[in-house]
Amino acid sequence: MPARAAAPLPMLLALGLAATNAPAGEALLPAPAAAARQEALPPIRHVFVLLLENQSYGVTFGSPSPASYLARALPARGALLTQYYAIGHASLGNYIALISGQAPNLATQLDCSTYADFRASAASLDRHGQLHGSGCIYPRSVPSLPDQLETAGFTWRAYMEDMGKNPAREPATCGHVPPGAAETTSVASAGDQYAAKHNPFVYFHSIIDDQVRCDTHVVNLERLPQDLASVSMTANYSFITPNLCSDGHDVHCIDGRTGGLPAIDQFLRRWVPLIEASPAFVADGLLIITFDESDGAGAEGSSACCAEKALPGARFQPGFSGPGGGRIGAIVLSKFVRPGTVSTVPYNHYSLLRTVEAIFGLPYLGYAAEQDLRTFGADVFSAAQPTG
């Protein structure tokens, strides 16, 4: 799956419509909002997003931290975004927002204990790019970042640790239970700690209904070293999900390891150097490491930034007791980032989606298109860039 260069301008101009072509029998939703202004960004062509679990900023980056590699070593090599926020509770709504701009609904707030189709209460997206209703698997007509990337000629791949280690639990690629079935992967099992609720790609019919497409793009994490071996094999966009122990979700892991932040540090010490040493990352790469949500404790745990909006008609705020998912922080690594950078500019998961879309010249989806939202700017990409 070779990486691609930038798509020609006519293709990008057509993308808003091309990404929303609905099959027969489904409503054709309006095109996603176009990028109203193109913020100046470095010439990044390989983006890696690595998502961890359930930690508040103060615990992760405070002193002392149970994760010295994450909290101290990595910020010294890149940028620490001190005002980066999750957009809700619990996990799944945050993951889905990162690749679609869709706000949490009651089903995704409850992590979709049943893998059920989204039940829309409106025929089309509203003016903010939101599909009203509730449910888990979004209809084919709801655009996602993978749809955008492919239409524009870019490549993507999602890497899921442990997926398929127990074939009776889920397949080794495109791992999910049958639509309509009870979700059986939310709790770790012996030998297989994959959780579908941490894999947003299997919550879009446009991906799971094309088995070859899904099997090709949603794979086990052990595939990553092979793909990192050359620029041509490395996807333009890579999404990395550790298992329920390695991502810090479980405090006491089923395999006997200590979970939480110590497990996160152990995972990062293995995988971050592999990514940083890869030819694609060295050439023009960007790695963002953040969490899905805070630990949810108190008002801080459900705080928000960036004038975040709820899904219209939703029964609860995105954070249940508050407007967001709490302050979590983020690490950004790239040759375009000056080591030791600290940014105090507010960002959230919609900001990250917007930044990825801006990097690849794509329209902004859902709440990533809000006028008050900004992409990562010079506060993050602070390293001097070549002039020619």
Task: Please give the residue ranges for each predicted region.
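Bacterial N-terminal signal peptides that target proteins for export
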Residues: M1-L9
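Bacterial N-terminal signal peptides
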Residues: P8-A18
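N-terminal pro-sequences and low-complexity stem/linker regions of secreted or lumenal proteins
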Residues: G25-G388
